[in-house]
């Protein structure tokens, strides 16, 4: 079904593209929010990525790669937003949780710890981590999406994972994994 919508959109069918956007906008926004940590910037990046996708859709060679292509556009927009220097205060940047809106207090505490850990990462490390763990991208797919070699993608995911683990251990004052040192 998605391939049919993509092919129709590539042929100029605005309704087909609108349906693709409707189907994917929540996930795109969630990814942008995780990367940028700001609701307004995430919304701007999502809208701009969808605009660029519509404008440049005819450049897409393989309709089966639409989702990966769209995520690549979104990541570029997130980087652009992050570099633009627009910043929100911490209070303005707080966004109601996406995944755990009605979760019990323990899940909210975990979400807060994860958000604090993500905040400590650079946008490059945070993006690699989100693509790998949230979207399930393989290392070559991350490299393709970010325009970096697979080895660089691997090192970013590894480093981000190490830093997140260390942050979670420090924040929760949990015992360290085997060997007594962060991994």
Which stretches of residues belong to each language-model region?
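N-terminal module of bacterial RNA polymerase sigma factors
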Residues: 1-27, 34, 116-119, 166, ...
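Internal acidic/polar
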Residues: 2, 80, 88-118, 138, ...
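Short, charged helix-capping/linker segments at alpha-helix termini
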Residues: 8-19, 29-48, 150, 173
């Amino acid at each position: 079904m998605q391939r049919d919508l993509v092919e129709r959109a590539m042929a100029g069918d605005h309704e087909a593209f609108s349906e693709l956007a409707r189907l994917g906008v929540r996930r795109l926004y969630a990814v942008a929010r995780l990367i940028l940590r700001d609701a307004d910037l995430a919304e701007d990046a999502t809208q701009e990525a969808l605009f660029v996708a519509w404008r440049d859709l005819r450049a897409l060679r393989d309709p089966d790669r639409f989702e990966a292509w769209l995520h690549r556009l979104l990541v570029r927009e997130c980087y652009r937003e992050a570099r633009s220097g627009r910043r929100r205060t911490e209070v303005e940047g707080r966004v109601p949780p996406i995944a755990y809106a009605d979760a019990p207090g323990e899940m909210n505490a975990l979400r807060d710890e994860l958000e604090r850990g993500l905040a400590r990462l650079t946008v490059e490390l945070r993006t690699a981590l989100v693509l790998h763990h949230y979207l399930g991208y393989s290392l070559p797919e991350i490299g393709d999406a970010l325009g970096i070699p697979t080895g660089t993608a691997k090192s970013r995911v590894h480093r981000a994972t190490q830093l997140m683990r260390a942050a979670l251990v420090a924040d929760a004052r949990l015992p360290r994994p085997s060997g007594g040192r962060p991994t």
